[in-house]
């Protein structure tokens, strides 16, 4: 069983990750309206990743005997005046999420909850990647976005992005799907 403070913080993070997915779908809607389907596609994949993060946190809580409760998900309240606005808002949001993960990590350290710290190591690394990806996209937009041909090419590049589920989440899902009673002698899950 997890420490109550850590469990509460992780449970709240589930909700924050779901909000992130909601926010990125809002960005995708904006870009669809603007005729930038590649940008929309990129943020649809971002939304899927955030949902995956929520599910990973949820599973960790459940596996540690914690009842997961969901809070309200706030409606994104932004209007985007330029194509750059969602990109900048996305970077700021990723920095915010990084600070939330860091706070949970710090609390786990203070409580000597090494198991949770190890679990969160993946999220710490992931947040570094998320911030870099958001920053790189802003740099590309500044470089190419002012020119219609450049914007078209960037849109095409973003449209080629392929969704990849986190390896540890996929492995855990497969383990649950197969189930102990269904494993054969050749199963890698012995």
Name each region found by the language model.
Residues 1-177:
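Iron-associated oxidoreductase/ferritin-like identity signal
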Residues 179-190:
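Positively charged, low-complexity/disordered segments
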